[in-house]
């Protein structure tokens, strides 16, 4: 059960960092890359 909690915490932390970097960059570049 502890392993599941630690995995969830790790994924949550990675998700928060990913969103922070994604939102830090200007949305214009992301939209242009997507098209």
Swiss-Prot record:
Membrane-spanning ranges: 3-23
Subcellular location: Plastid, Chloroplast thylakoid membrane
Keyword line: Chloroplast, Membrane, Photosynthesis, Photosystem II, Plastid, Thylakoid, Transmembrane, Transmembrane helix
Quaternary data: PSII is composed of 1 copy each of membrane proteins PsbA, PsbB, PsbC, PsbD, PsbE, PsbF, PsbH, PsbI, PsbJ, PsbK, PsbL, PsbM, PsbT, PsbY, PsbZ, Psb30/Ycf12, at least 3 peripheral proteins of the oxygen-evolving complex and a large number of cofactors. It forms dimeric complexes.
Protein's recorded name: Photosystem II reaction center protein T
Keyword Transmembrane set for record: yes
Entry membrane topology: Single-pass membrane protein
PANTHER family xrefs: PHOTOSYSTEM II REACTION CENTER PROTEIN T, PTHR36411
Function field: Found at the monomer-monomer interface of the photosystem II (PS II) dimer, plays a role in assembly and dimerization of PSII. PSII is a light-driven water plastoquinone oxidoreductase, using light energy to abstract electrons from H(2)O, generating a proton gradient subsequently used for ATP formation.
Protein source organism: Aristolochia macrophylla (Dutchman's pipe vine)
Family in the record: Belongs to the PsbT family.
């Amino acid at each position: 059960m502890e392993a599941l909690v630690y995995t969830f915490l790790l994924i949550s932390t990675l998700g928060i960092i990913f969103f922070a970097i994604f939102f830090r960059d200007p949305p214009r570049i992301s939209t242009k890359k997507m098209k």
